[in-house]
Amino acid sequence: MTLISSVEHKKYIKISSGNYRVWAEWILDYEQYKYPEDLDMVSKLIVDNLEMKFCPPRYRDENMGNPLFGHCYHATQALYYFFKDTNLKAFAAPCKIAQQHWWVQDGDNIIDITAGQYEAFGIDPPYDKGKETKWYGWKNRPHRKSQNLMKLVQPSANLYFKQYEEKPKKVY
């Protein structure tokens, strides 16, 4: 049985202090993969579909010679959502080569599809400092980069924009 899921990146407008309304959202409808059977295949597909445009600008120079560098967050988030209904947990830790490093864990089993970036620096990923964490970003919503990467990995997925009202004007 195929499990269809959605990942929504909602756009909010502030109504009043602490009160927000969704005015639009990017939605990705996709098929979840089977864990752990499809883990190696999905990991390879994610790595094979990493593009420079997904890498934050501050990491792009280093990424030129180290193609996994700067991709841990969105690659890990994509992996997490492809296996959304499993027991995977998001982990992060401060690291020497960038601000944070991200991976997922299944119990004590570390699953880090961008760990290879550390080989160029001759150091190990900072798993010893890792803690289970929520995704960063407002309301822990998935990043658009993660949705775009997931669409590349699974071309049959449907990525679309749904607008509920006109784009609100910012009031300062």
Pin down the residues of each PLM region.
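A structural boundary/capping signal
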Residues: T2-Y172
